[in-house]
Each structure stands twice: as C-alpha cells, then as structure tokens.
Amino acid sequence: MLQLKDGLSLKSQLSLVFYHTVVLLLLTQSCGGQPQVIGPLRLTVSIVGDDIILPCHLEPATDAAAMTIEWLRPDLDPIFVHVRHHGQEILINKHLSYEGRTSLFIDKLKHGDISLKLSKVKLSDEGKYRCFIPSLDRQSIIELVVGAVSSPVISLAGLNKASSGVVLGCESKGWYPEPEVFWLDGEGNILSAGPTETVRGPDGLYTVSSRVTVEKTDTNRFTCRVQQQNINQTRETHIHVP
C-alpha cells in the first residue's frame, strides 16, 4: 500500500480529512446557521420605583415577531415573567408579582430586539432572568441588581465639652444594599467619625446613622455622604455650623 512521508496511508489521510470536514460543517450549522440570543456583559442596575430595560437581542438581527419569546426567573414559582406566543402575551402561569409591569417593544421585534421593559421596579425583582427563544433553543442570562436610596438628614446633636466642638448627627433611611457613611469638611477631606450604626427593617431596607465631632474651620461647612458602590449611588447633605 502506498505510504506517505508521515507514515499514514493515503486512505487514512483521506478519512482524516473527511472527518475534519464533517466536524467543521456541524460546527458551522450549530453556531452560524441560527441566530444567537445575546444579553449584556455587565449587571443591569435599577433603583426601586424606576422603570428598567433588561437588554436582549438576536444576533445577527432576525425578525422575532412571530417567535415565542419567554422571559423567566428560575428561582420563582411559577417561573414565567413574560411570555409572548402567536403575537400575544400569555398571562396563564405568569408570576403574580409581575402582573401589569412587563412589556416587550413590539415595533422592535422585527429587528431582533427582544428586550423586556420592567416598570415600577421592586426590591424583590432582583435576581437572574433568562431570555429564551424555544424554537432556537437559545437563551441568555441577565442579572438585575436592585437598589434603594434616600438623602441623609443632618442634625446638631450637641456640644463636646472636652474639645468645645460641635457634635453632628447624620441619618439616612431606606437603603439597599447596605451603604457606607462618610463625613467631609469644606475642602472635601474625610473626617474621622464614630462607627456607623446600621439597622435593617422588616422591609429589607437599611437605616444608617453616624456622628462626628467637628471644630470650627474657615468655612464651617460639613457634608454627610452616603454611598453604595454596587449600585453606583451617592447621596449627600451639607450643613453650615454657625
């Protein structure tokens, strides 16, 4: 039998080429033959009470108007957040907490945009959502992080007799996740303050409070800043001490 330089017979090499060709065709059909369901690369963040869009689209852009589109949360029972079938929303088995708060952009479906609009976001909406097209057997996971914020309130808490300084108090209610509290002087420098007191209410929201003793400065202007880095939110209040 004819042998090639690498020691394989011509028949063996032809078989190997045929095998690789078949594998390539299968990969092309499975990956390139159907559109993919694409979600965002980063977390989607919303504040309680806001409207939010959970991004999801077909790539390449494909008309999804006639497709069944399912938005799900696997951790819920029932798991269905929004289902569109035969051009209509299916309300059977939709989770009660999402009734009247979800919608698709009907005019954008023909361009492959299957994003979900979620109105009046609740704290309980936080979680992982699945954007799923059954006919394509394709899906994408979109994670929603929900936050709650409020502006802090500063009060004159008293006098420090030992240092003749003024004690300032700061409180901010209704935060989620748990925030940090900072005191700043008129130049923006962080002041040394006592430990932050944190209380979590039955609604899951946090109340934080802090005290600081300040001395007179050129401006006598001080700031209480409350921030939560995970949701990229900051609230602050200023006070001028006479």
Q: Model-flagged regions — what are they?
A:
Residues 34-40, 148-158:
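Proline-enriched interdomain boundary motifs that mark the N-terminal boundary
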Residues 56, 71, 129-131, 144, ...:
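Core motif of extracellular immunoglobulin-like domains
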Residues 59-101, 176-195, 223:
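N-terminal V-set
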Residues 63, 124, 129-149, 221-242:
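Extracellular/luminal immunoglobulin-like beta-sandwich modules
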Residues 53-59, 167-173:
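Short edge beta-strand/loop segments characteristic of extracellular beta-sandwich folds
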Residues 51, 124-126, 165, 217-221:
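Extracellular Ig-like/FN3 beta-sandwich strand-entry sites
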Residues 1-48, 144:
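N-terminal Sec-dependent signal peptide, specifically the hydrophobic helical h-region
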Residues 51-57, 68, 99-144:
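Ligand-binding face of N-terminal immunoglobulin V-set domains in extracellular IgSF glycoproteins
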